[in-house]
Amino acid sequence: FDLANNYGHPSNGLAEKNFGQALKDCLGTYRDELVISTKAGYDMWPGPYGNWGSRKYLMASLDQSLTRMGLDYVDIFYHHRPDPETPIEETMGALCDIVSSGKALYVGLSNYKEEETRKAVKILKENGTPCLIHQPRYNMLERWVEDGLLSALDENGEIVVDAVRYCIDGKYACACPSISRQPIQPESK
């Protein structure tokens, strides 16, 4: 299950809250068989520590995510996007401490470009926390990962998970509610 602190409409965190309810109602007995991930990095609350990659934001965000889902830990905690202001050492240090605390088993990156990924992975490895996975936007329309990122990931042994944001032919759009991020389109021919 792939979640993030800012997923949900009409309010951030609603996807995690709904998932937490489903986990409580019917999936809880399967927890050891589930891989649950969440992310932090986008706008979550107003103020200087409401987004990006500061230690304060990442720690607080994960604590809130765990509360919404009713969990003690997640399998994977991603940093959702690089932070142009916070030193990467602070962001990666926070991820290492999150794993050390037992609140996440593994860490991942999302939307990091090649050079950012190389720096982040190096810092994580130096601190004994390997980067398990990278989730870029990669599809027929967004192929930027082919400009070096895939090679960097292959060198370090990370898994790439495609975050497909587009349904080219609209085949599944008719099943989406009107408030979905996926626009409703007529059935393709």
What does each of the following model-derived ranges do?
Residues R31-M44, Q135-R137:
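A short, structured active-site edge motif that brings together acidic residues
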Residues A22-V35, L66-G70, C96-V99, V121-G128:
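Acidic (Asp/Glu)-rich catalytic clusters
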Residues P82-K189:
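Beta/alpha (TIM)-barrel catalytic core signal, keyed to glycine-rich beta->alpha loops juxtaposed to Asp/Glu
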Residues D43-M59, H80-T86:
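Active-site mouth loops of central-metabolism enzymes
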Residues W52-M69, E90-G93, T117-V121:
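Short, acidic/polar
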Residues D2-V35, P183:
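N-terminal binding-site loop/beta-alpha segment at the start of enzyme catalytic domains
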Residues L66-P87:
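Active-site groove signature of glycoside hydrolases
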Residues F1, V74, V107:
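Glycine-centered flexible beta-alpha turn that most often forms the glycine-rich phosphate-binding loop
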